[in-house]
Amino acid sequence: MRYLLIDLSYYVFYRYFAIVNYIKLSTKTTPNLENVLENKEFMTKFDEMFEKSLLKIVKQNYGIKNLALSSDLQIIFAKDCSRANIWRQDHFQGYKACRDHVKKKDHFDGLIFEHVYSRVLPQLMKKYYSIHEFYVDRAEADDCIAVLIDCI
């Protein structure tokens, strides 16, 4: 059995800003990111590319052309716990405290995560039985992946 472990937050951030750049280049305008969930053009492209990019990764790195028919690859999206619950907060005061400033500067709408958690990921898990999510209450996705590597 082969495994593909993906840090879901990283994947979401990457897709989000890739779509922002795509829209900037294709329309020569900056997309309205005030309430990204209401931006139909952005959300349609985000949903489309979330799956399409995953399938491209699977094809290029694992040689799988039809994920729905594959039985030898398991894809695990590791989810971050909420920032307030990260175990490192107990040891490092202000851990990731500067992230809010960066989000405001970059116009990142964190509601995209709720969209991915409640809509995009469940649809993919229903469509492709080889896709799963993994979550630990006080751990970030990269911590989860580090532990999973030792277990599989």
What is the predicted role of each segment?
Residues 2-152:
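Noncatalytic, basic helical substrate-engagement surface that gates or grips nucleic-acid strands
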